[in-house]
Amino acid sequence: MISTHVLDAGRGVPLPGVLVRLSRLEPLDTTRVISELTTDDDGRIPTLASEALEVGFYRLEFHLDGLGSTFFRAVQLDLRVDDPTRSYHVPLLVAPFGVTSYRGS
């Protein structure tokens, strides 16, 4: 399972309405879109994939262009799933001129 939480680090509040796309990275630099969801009022998407994950690489794309409060139009994170039975929580903290992400719990 992959989940996310998007926060406005400058104001200390969640960011609702952020479009997040999850894709699986396939051979030859192709991608297969798994889901496109929008963060809820608390800035969360509890489950980005309804299908079972496989070992491999995935891409999270956060579309920030509608926010108006950040320099970044979008943020793309490529991550590795080593164990599909584990949960992968990937928060994104957005500031006017910077972004931070990490593997949460």
Question: Over which residues does each language-model region extend?
Answer:
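Compositionally biased low-complexity segments at domain edges in trafficked proteins
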Residues: S87-S105
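Beta-strand-dominated extracellular/periplasmic modules and repeats
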Residues: M1-D83, H89-P91
